[in-house]
Amino acid sequence: MFKSGFVTIVGRPNVGKSTLLNAIMKEKLSIVSCRPQTTRNNIQTILTEDNYQLVFVDTPGIHKPKHKLGEYMVKSASDAMKDVDLVLFLINPDEKPGRGDLFIIEQLKEVKVPVFLVLNKIDENPQEKVAETLKTYSELMEFEEIIPISALKGKNIDLLKELMFKYIPEGPQYYPEDMIIDQNERFIVAEIVREKALRLLSEEVPHGIAVEILQMKKNEKGTYHIEGNILCEKNSHKPIIIGKGGSKLKKISQYARQDIEAFLQSKVYIRLWVKVKEEWRDNQSLLKELGYKKMK
């Protein structure tokens, strides 16, 4: 008997959805940063074992949109809860249910598939706090399963996999067993660069950063030559991203190259520039060029 199903991970921004997905896959597949709203596209990730295949949809965190990109991110997360077989609602025990959580719960009450409540970061919180959070959420909605985990340390991840297998239906293998992600290499490379920029820039530059890959070629020796732009919204952000004498941009390139080489399993040369695109997050045509679906 072979089972297969689509699983959506939902939760507030910065709750650890991408970290959970990476823990399940044991690979760095989805951009992980300490800053909220770092996942911008639904990333379908495929886990294939001997007797099942799970297709995970890692979504942007649900939040009140402030621009066209924000609208896209929220719509993307909401759409991901439709036509799936299982939903994982990820929360942190140290945070009381906020408006974002209540908004998600109202949506979850409408879905016709099993919903798991997954408590992340249990290693960082006392048992009393975890129990209190469990009680609070259980009173808001009935969940098929409640699983405490630590995505960062991998605690109870195998248990979570076992429970997901229990609930998904019998079905075909949708993707080849050696395929782990349905996004192309260029998309992943852009996300790696963006993650490094977010980490190194800290609070100096807000979320108005995007990455466009201009060129990605592989020579006869198997070496990739990559060129790209880091887009920012204000002229004042450009020197911050570049840094004194180009130091910040050099670090972004260096750290990105290391992860890109691990991802592509090849030597990589990368050149990055910084380009100002004012209000790019409200530019529908540019958002489309960067890979974001058109808003209806």
UniProtKB/Swiss-Prot annotation:
Region feature (G3): 58-61
Where does the UniProt annotation place the signal sequence?
Answer: none
Q: Region G4: start and end of each range?
A: 120-123
Name one cellular component (GO) term. Answer: plasma membrane
Q: Which gene is the coding source of this polypeptide chain?
A: era
Q: Which residues form the KH type-2 domain?
A: 201-278
Instruction: Give the quaternary structure.
Output: Monomer.
Asked whether the UniProt record includes Lyase among its keywords, one would answer no
Q: Where is this region: G5?
A: 149-151
Name the record gives this protein: GTPase Era
One GO biological process this protein is involved in is: ribosomal small subunit assembly
State the Pfam families in the record. KH_2, MMR_HSR1
The record's annotation in PANTHER family points to: GTPASE ERA (PTHR42698), GTPASE ERA, MITOCHONDRIAL (PTHR42698:SF1)
Q: What does this protein do?
A: An essential GTPase that binds both GDP and GTP, with rapid nucleotide exchange. Plays a role in 16S rRNA processing and 30S ribosomal subunit biogenesis and possibly also in cell cycle regulation and energy metabolism.
Q: Which family does it belong to?
A: Belongs to the TRAFAC class TrmE-Era-EngA-EngB-Septin-like GTPase superfamily. Era GTPase family.
Domain Era-type G intervals: 3-170
Against NCBIfam families, the record matches this protein to: era, PRK00089.1, small_GTP
Amino acids binding GTP = 11-18, 58-62, 120-123
Localization per record: Cytoplasm; Cell membrane
Q: Which organism is it from?
A: Clostridium botulinum (strain Okra / Type B1)
The way this protein sits in the membrane is described as: Peripheral membrane protein
Q: Name one GO molecular function term.
A: GTPase activity
